[in-house]
Amino acid sequence: MAVLQASKVIKRLKAASALKDSAADRRQVLRQTTADEVRAAGQPYTSVYLYMLNGEELVLKAFSGRSPKHLSIEVGCGVCGTAVAEGKDQNVPDVAARDNYIACNRRTRSELVVLFRKNREIVGLIDIHSDVVDPFSKEEEAALKKVADALGDLL
């Protein structure tokens, strides 16, 4: 499995950022482009969900892959909510071993959650699912972190 090419995704995000005049349209295009481009990298990415923080709740704003089961998640709940509550990215090699895992799909075996920030404040996250146990290497995490950082800067 290949590592995501962060520079390629970031280049497409920058191009997408220039396409829309209104800030709301531009933000939505950036969110959807992120989900589509990350998933387009292929295996191990089964589904990619992009949540934005709204108070104490994460709200789904874009996805690519399987239809989402959760349109919102409370901070502190599940892998996504834990990432925000702890302020740390989460790499869960085997979701079956995680006590607070919230099942989105019965085929999902692993999950990687990468936070993104605006002015050092958490504003959202990229939630990646895989049907493979333990597919996300440190290099994969680092590549996704670059994409998340770029997204935070562009939003």
For each feature predicted by the language model, list its residue ranges.
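Juxtadomain coupling helices with adjacent low-complexity linkers
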Residues: A2-V3, S17, S130-L155
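Sensory-domain boundary capping and coupling elements
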Residues: R117-S130
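Intrinsically disordered, low-complexity terminal regulatory regions
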Residues: M1-S67, L155
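A short, aliphatic-rich beta-strand micro-motif
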Residues: S110-R117
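Short hydrophobic/aromatic beta-strand element in the GNAT-like acyltransferase core
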Residues: S47, V113, L125
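Regulatory sensory and allosteric helical modules in signal-transduction proteins
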Residues: Y45, L53-R106
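Residues at secondary-structure transition points
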Residues: D25, H70, E74, G78, ...
